């Protein structure tokens, strides 16, 4: 059932936790999963309140919420069931879940919701459930109340310990004393023993240290002291001291006890004497006895009282001592805990500081990384943009574009377009703003280039000799005067103040950098006032609390100027509202008491008594209000408090600020409050903005001068963050130690200590924020104090305090000296200015007053310029007054005096020597002319920028169009054709011709004709494609793009000309109104007919002149002049003529003529306007003389007019109306007497009118020259742009023609190559196998595709093994193996039968090819000799060994290789059966592999070489495997024993032992007998009889000798041959002693028995192995029998059959009968 429920929960419901039957009870013990199941069935609506925790509260909550839902489903669920589930009772959760599963399935079938089920339930059940739940709830509440009452009762019970009896106490104390004594004795004995051992060790160490002193000195620094017994010795010594002290105390107590006993004894003696005396007195009367008894009783009571009082005093003393000791212990514990807490807090502070430092470093890194990434992106954008335009412009990027991109890159603006600047966009995005910024930057740069005539607008070669127009200084002066008249407040001169010797500065630094300490030291040595902002704020608040009244008069206007911030706060109500009337913040949790105080303050502030307070008290009130509201004091309020304090300091006294300002805003406010920096800077900036840019006044500078700083010096006490934290910790540590030391001593100064404690806590809490705030604000402050003038001095504050103070004092003394020198220099400059300015001030006082009051006002405002005019006009007046000349002589005298200064020529208008006319003008005129000029300037600049922007965009469009034209034409040339289809069809037909017809002449002729037809068809295709390409080029040329582009470009340049003409017209109008107003004339009416520069009409539509605002010029003129124009030879077309391009050039010349005509028209319009203005001046002058003739009827007026005309002659261009100027003296009939004053006034007016006219015309002519120059520049620029555009377009058209011709020639050449290839194959009568590819202009033979398959290559024959040097082939070996396996399956055969078989195979079966030819000449003696070499126990032969030997050559295995092969076989033999299959055999491999380097022959008909080693590996498995099993099994140990054979008999035995044991067995020392045997064997060697084998035998002997030498040299380790060997393994190694009658194939049932078994058993028993258990190899090898057996055992000797074969061949060769093998050897 549990599995069903788990499947239902995990798969169907998929609850949040996987449920298994083992953890079923635990999973549902908290009720969360039950709630989740009900929630999935929409029954548990409050499932969000369930908890997954396994706490008791969570379980109670979950099951309380589950109960009504389970009852709703009709399940039985109460406290017992819940407790069973909570306690994980087996089966409880399963039972409930099963019931829930059934109930939910029923609900699922009915389809009812939880609410419907609840409504369908009877009301009785619901009522019962509610009663049960209420009863349970009441029961829980009662139980809880009862538990609380019992807990209170238990807590109220006082546990009184039961006193112990005196006897038990004394016994326990006695036991404790005995125990302590015993422990002391034990410790003393141990100490004595330990000291004795220490002395011995020290003696030994001293003796050793003398011998190894040098090595100890070298290694002591490197070794670690892992164990030290100093602490242990100290503890023992301390304990000994304590024991000695205890003994002394015990002696004292014993002595005190003896003294007490002695005193008690004396008391007893005295009592005894008294008793004796009493007894004697008792003899007296009864009354005396009663008296004595009473006295004795009183005495006893007195004694008792005395003892009680002594006992109480002792108790009091013990209590005081205990309290004192407890206080000391408590203080020590508190100090220790405080130190621990302080260390932890310090560590936390350091961690927080390091974390903040890391965060700041990360922020800086991210910021720098972002900047670098942004720069890198912009560099990539620039590179890609350059690459794109190199592609567009053929690597010839225009200089203007590159310059614009560099500007954008240096400005950090993206080069690529972020978004399109549409006009309908209402809300600009970030990309939109970036595009607008980029556009504005490029527009401004283009405008500056145009204005300054640099860059793209630099003067061309034609205008290099002509000088550019100069600045119109007259217009600049006029505009400046108008601006000053319009804004007179900007020209008011400020009152200068006398410089002060007081030094002003501030000292800044991090928290606890030593600012206050340094200032205290500085204050002791210098008369300097220190201002601390914290102290000033506290004093201001205190002044408010004390209601300090203002004892000073109201501030004057000068004070208002010096301190605008304070006075604004004092006077302005709006600022009071902004600063003080702060609405309460909703998050502020102020108490009602604070609210009442704030309301009281508001009422007090609104009263009249608040205004009577001093300024400091008012500022303190505002500060307190901000602090009460939980806000910081604003910077402006702090600066006001500080400035108010500075005002109270005497002017000549120096002052220094302590730690202020700390932010840039505070520094700016302080600078503004002390110097008015911001107000003056804004005035200068506003004046600079109002300055005209098109015309400048050379006498005024537009640069904003930097104002001096309010401070003379700023000192930074530089310390590191760690030093600040360390100083904070030191202060807090001292405070903690001070608190602990004075905690219990009367507690003096509790309030002060509490304040210091709160300050230290506040310091510690805010030290991190203060440091971070300083680090954030200091870079801006450093820039503020070093930018205009470097007044900052950094001092390292981490040095000694006295040295730091000394450094600061030196800096202050230096600043004091510098300030004194500066003040003296300023005073000297002012004195020199006064002396120099005194003489020019006298002539105006001596000169007579002017005629009008306006000129007097002009004198007051412009003191210098009128002075020059007055000095010129004073001399004739002085002569007229002081000379007393008659009235008739005065004009003569003036006429005579005027031509006298002929040496210096009169200054020209606009030069530096020219004195500008500054006659008064109407007050309302500047208010009209200044906005009018601003409109002129703004419209001119915007017009120029817009046109230049369109020209810039036009350049981009031209490049894009030309690139698209080139690429589209190239794609058109590369459009696909159908030539390949014809070529493929021809190739298929050509290859399908039968081979027997290739040599037929008619066939060849037919094929040649087909080639000609193919060529003609391909030629037709090329011709058609060429005609289509030419038509496409002609269509591109005939497009109207070039004409439209030229027309648009011309219109842009015409717009530039229009802008210049408009500027000139507006400037002329402004100058005309200005000078006419100066002459008190009425301005002329505004003529609305402005000159319009015509534009080019782009489309051919005819529009009436009434519908046009701007005149249009038709594109192509129908006049005979345009039709007769011939193109200039060599202008654009070079080489052969091209009619379409000639038409383009003709159109360009027409456009060039239109451009020149338009320029000439604009230039002529400007000249006409100047001429009209001059004519108007002359006309007005002609009209004015009749008005003057009524007053001036003397002939001298004619002379004056002639003089005026002589002055005006060089200034005019046309002098056609001189007759009119001479008509005035004709009208004079009778002279009238004129007074000298009237004469002087008339002369002055005439001179003024002449100067106004001269200045006006000079300004107008300067503007005309500038406009004409600009028009000339625009004309040349337009011509160069249009010529460049036409040149680029014609180059593209020519390039298209070049591509077309080149492609056509390439296609024809490809067709020619194809024809030659086809004719070659026809003549050579060969097919074309590879595909011929002819597409577009490419022709080649595709070597990857063949149209018909190649003939199949011949198959290579299989490899065949050949006989070489008498070696048996693999086939021969397999045949011999099969025959021997049939005869002797066990591998052992009789030697007689073996030799007979070999003889029969050699002599009788000659056609079977069982042996090579070299074996056919073996005699019976040779075969018997071979048999004797293979004989085992003189009777049998191992035919497997024979086949292994005859299979040579194969690589002889070394002992290590055999062991490695054995380990690989064992690793694959997982069952350790000793056998493996063929697959495992191939996987493990032998010591040699069959992967030989086989050379594949080049001839495909030649077979591959035979891989003999690979076949040998397979043959060895067939040779040694047991084929009777399925699959065949190989005994790998037995096989490796065969391969252990060695030419050296002894070595072969040891190799076999190593293979059997599985590890290397070292050889024992050889005996002389063994050496003798080897010598005898070597003497029998037949090498001497056969000289042919001498060399090979000598080589083998040499190898054997080297191997023996190696074995001799091999060192035998001590633990060598310790491996154990068993009896079975030993019998397996020496298996040659098996007596087996295996002469025929029917003897397999016979049992084998080893002849060495009995001897081995005896050997094992001799060596101690009674039960024949395995023994060590080294022990076994020491036994004499084993040594003798190893020395004489020859089964592991590798027989040398090759020697017998060579001897047989040698014998045959001597008889003249050569074997086939020798013949083959000789041939080779």
Swiss-Prot record:
Q: Where is the composition biased (Basic residues)?
A: 1210-1221
Report the coiled-coil segments. Answer: 170-203, 255-351, 665-691, 995-1021
The ranges of region (Disordered) come to 545-576, 828-910, 1177-1241, 1580-1618, 1704-1724
Keyword field:
Cell projection, Cilium, Coiled coil, Cytoplasm, Cytoskeleton, Differentiation, Flagellum, Golgi apparatus, Spermatogenesis
- Which species is listed as the source? Mus musculus (Mouse)
Q: Name one GO cellular component term.
A: Golgi apparatus
Q: Where in the cell is it found?
A: Cell projection, Cilium, Flagellum; Cytoplasm; Cytoplasm, Cytoskeleton; Golgi apparatus
Family annotation (PROSITE patterns):
CH
> Where is the sequence biased in composition, kind Basic and acidic residues?
558-576, 853-862, 1177-1194, 1592-1607
Tissue expression notes: Highly expressed in testis, where it primarily localizes to late spermatocytes, round spermatids and elongating spermatids (at protein level). Found in Sertoli cells of the testis (at protein level). Expressed at lower levels in epididymis (at protein level). Detected in lung, brain, liver and kidney. Also detected in bone, cartilage, trachea, pituitary gland and eye. Expressed in osteoblasts and chondrocytes.
Tell me the protein's name.
Sperm flagellar protein 2
The record describes its quaternary structure and partners as: Interacts (via C-terminus) with IFT20. Interacts with DYNC1I2.
